[in-house]
Swiss-Prot record:
Single biological process term from Gene Ontology: methanogenesis
Catalytic activity: coenzyme B + methyl-coenzyme M = methane + coenzyme M-coenzyme B heterodisulfide
Keywords: Cytoplasm, Methanogenesis, Nickel, Transferase
Keyword match Cytoplasm: yes
Top-rank EC class of the record's enzyme: transferase
One Gene Ontology term of the molecular function aspect: coenzyme-B sulfoethylthiotransferase activity
Protein's name according to its UniProt entry: Methyl-coenzyme M reductase subunit alpha
Compartments reported by the entry: Cytoplasm
Pathway linked to the protein: One-carbon metabolism; methyl-coenzyme M reduction; methane from methyl-coenzyme M: step 1/1
Cysteine disulfide partners in this protein: none
Family (UniProt): Belongs to the methyl-coenzyme M reductase alpha subunit family.
EC number: 2.8.4.1
GO cellular component: cytoplasm
Amino acid sequence: AADIFAKFKTSMEVK
């Protein structure tokens, strides 16, 4: 379940 959250956080950080 944290997989999706981690992916989202990474996307936001990169942005």
